[in-house]
Amino acid sequence: MAKKSIVQRNLRRIKLCDQYGEKRERLKSIINNKNIPIGERFAAQNKLIKELPRDSSKIRIRNRCALTGRPRGVYRKFGLCRIVLRGLCSFGKIPGITKSSW
């Protein structure tokens, strides 16, 4: 189990990313557009750094297991880590997944 504080921090980052995502994308498009004058691009970059929280960036979000909070070995399709997924699959808790045999 991951510490509750770390899981909560990640949830806060997800919420901030949803809240500021649109504004961040607009500023990033201005910064990366070569047709806009350099002064405006620098102003947009300054605004991005000063006004938006650092945690509102998508890159700071970590995929974590929904049950344990484990940060590694997480399957995106299920939102579970490999250990929990294997346990749930072996007990038949996930529909459509069966142990292979040949």
UniProtKB/Swiss-Prot annotation:
GO terms for molecular function: rRNA binding; structural constituent of ribosome. PROSITE patterns: RIBOSOMAL_S14. It holds the Pfam family Ribosomal_S14. Signal peptide: none annotated. GO terms for cellular component: cytoplasm; small ribosomal subunit. One of its GO terms (biological process) is translation. Keywords: Ribonucleoprotein, Ribosomal protein, RNA-binding, rRNA-binding. Binds 16S rRNA, required for the assembly of 30S particles and may also be responsible for determining the conformation of the 16S rRNA at the A site. Part of the 30S ribosomal subunit. Contacts proteins S3 and S10. HAMAP family: Ribosomal_uS14_1 (MF_00537). Belongs to the universal ribosomal protein uS14 family. This is Small ribosomal subunit protein uS14. It comes from Wolbachia sp. subsp. Brugia malayi (strain TRS).
